[in-house]
């Protein structure tokens, strides 16, 4: 597998296997989008994520093992309360917005509980759309 300069990590210590599940969904062609609250990005991180549009990126697991490559096709903002349907579908939720929202409430539960994240209808999400690259 070719390793690209740009890197995207799925998973974190204590994620109860979520990162691995997301990587498996990418590999199976079931996941073609990801998102994170804009408030969790630094200015430099925001600049960097927007520059990934059109770029090839290597996906790593939480143990820093390269797992696959993706091509980022678009990066944009949407809100948690009215998410762009490309995000909802790309996350594997079809047209089920409420399911998408509940999945992300659970994924970000620790951040919400610790006060690091306030999640509401107006929370801005940075969205990355991508396709799996076989190389």
From Swiss-Prot:
Residues 18-130 form the ASCH domain. It comes from the Bacteria. SUPFAM superfamilies: PUA domain-like (SSF88697). Coiled coil: none annotated. InterPro entries: ASCH_domain (IPR007374), DUF984 (IPR009326), PUA-like_sf (IPR015947). Gene3D superfamilies: Sulfate adenylyltransferase. This is Uncharacterized protein YhfF. It comes from Bacillus subtilis (strain 168). The lineage of its organism: Bacteria, Bacillati, Bacillota, Bacilli, Bacillales.
């Amino acid at each position: 597998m070719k390793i690209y300069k740009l890197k995207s990590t799925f998973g974190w210590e204590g994620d109860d296997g979520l990162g691995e599940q997301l990587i498996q969904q990418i590999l199976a062609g079931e996941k073609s989008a990801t998102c994170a609250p804009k408030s969790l990005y630094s200015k430099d991180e925001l600049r960097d994520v927007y520059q990934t549009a059109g770029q090839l990126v290597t996906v790593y697991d939480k143990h820093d093992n390269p797992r696959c490559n993706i091509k980022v096709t678009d990066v944009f903002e949407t809100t948690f309360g009215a998410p762009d349907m490309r995000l909802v579908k790309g996350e594997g939720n079809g047209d089920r917005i409420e399911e998408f929202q509940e999945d992300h409430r659970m994924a970000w539960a620790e951040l919400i509980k610790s006060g690091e994240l306030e999640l509401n209808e107006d929370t801005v999400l940075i969205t990355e759309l991508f396709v799996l690259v076989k190389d």
